[in-house]
């Protein structure tokens, strides 16, 4: 469980607990093809982590009232490229995935 008081009121977040070493690709397979292509050659556990975290990001964007249908691609250093008016952060580790987003006018950066 994540403590909502850790985030500003304007932030929306999504968390997911999964089985350790999960290779469930359900959410990965739901991603935009351009997102799936970012890790197309990775092992299944990496695809599952990536897919779950990106899926959480899309859920959080929708909760924020933003278009969640566009792919969240990567910048040159691997960071997520959020929509222009949004700041956010992704995380994934064994058994846990999460994303948090907020309007950039109110929250300049997160991480």
Residue ranges and their predicted role:
Residues 1-110:
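Core catalytic alpha/beta fold that binds nucleotide/phospho-ligands
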């Amino acid at each position: 469980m994540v403590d909502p008081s850790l985030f500003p009121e304007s932030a929306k977040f999504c968390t997911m607990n999964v089985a350790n070493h999960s290779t469930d690709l359900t959410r990965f397979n739901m991603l935009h093809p351009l997102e799936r292509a970012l890790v197309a050659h990775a092992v299944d556990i990496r695809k599952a982590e990536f897919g779950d975290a990106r899926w959480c990001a899309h859920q959080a964007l929708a909760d924020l009232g933003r278009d969640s249908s566009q792919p969240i691609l990567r910048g040159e250093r691997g960071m997520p490229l959020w929509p222009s008016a949004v700041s956010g952060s992704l995380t994934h580790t064994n058994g846990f995935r999460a994303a948090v987003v907020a309007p950039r006018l109110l929250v300049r950066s997160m991480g």
